[in-house]
Amino acid sequence: MSNSSKKHLDLPYRPGVGMMILNADNHIFVGKRIDTKISAWQMPQGGIVPGETPSIAAMREMLEEIGSDKGYIIAESKCWYSYDVPSFLIPKLWNGNFRGQKQRWFLIRFTGNNEDININTSNPEFDQWRWASLDELLSIIIPFKRKLYQAVVKEFESLIQ
């Protein structure tokens, strides 16, 4: 293990939230990240502001990332899930202060329509978006988040059927 890898393992996780947003057909909102050349699709996620509860952060992040907060929380994950970003990304993300994120996940029912979604926000994270089926979700997600997504799907799957 290199010194830089060991140093990265000593970094904390950034506290955040993730949102599995369902439409009326139980398809899941995914966005293609704007900051990479590869096809990196993900569900919306973001940080928790100090003093903010995870559920408040989830609804704020939903509005910030998809331009709408039309929806309600169905469920909150029972635990915090974490993932590490590849070491080459650490200096580029969060000023190099975190090795990845620990997240509380929320299953959210979107009550708006497609026209309510606007990814061209003041700080856009996505350049494309679509609704994905539960079956295809894991195959389109960026690989370093796949294990976390598998755990989230397993926890929420019975509520999606």
From Swiss-Prot:
Q: Which GO terms describe its molecular function?
A: mRNA 5'-diphosphatase activity
Task: Cite the Nudix hydrolase domain residue spans from the record.
Answer: 12-154
What organism is listed for this UniProt entry?
A: Rickettsia rickettsii (strain Sheila Smith)
Q: What is the lineage of its organism?
A: Bacteria, Pseudomonadati, Pseudomonadota, Alphaproteobacteria, Rickettsiales
Membrane-spanning segments: none
The record, for NCBIfam families, names:
PRK00714.1-3 (NF001936), PRK00714.1-5 (NF001938)
Give the UniProt entry's GO cellular component terms.
cytoplasm
> Which cofactors go with this protein?
a divalent metal cation
Q: Kindly state which keywords UniProt assigns to this record, in alphabetical order.
A: Hydrolase
Name listed for the protein in its UniProt record: RNA pyrophosphohydrolase
Q: Motif Nudix box: list the residue ranges.
A: 46-67
Q: What's the EC number here?
A: 3.6.1.-
Query: Its function?
Result: Accelerates the degradation of transcripts by removing pyrophosphate from the 5'-end of triphosphorylated RNA, leading to a more labile monophosphorylated state that can stimulate subsequent ribonuclease cleavage.
Can you tell me which family this protein belongs to?
Belongs to the Nudix hydrolase family. RppH subfamily.
Q: Which InterPro entries match?
A: NUDIX_hydrolase-like_dom_sf, NUDIX_hydrolase_CS, NUDIX_hydrolase_dom, RppH
What's any GO biological process attached to this entry?
Answer: mRNA catabolic process
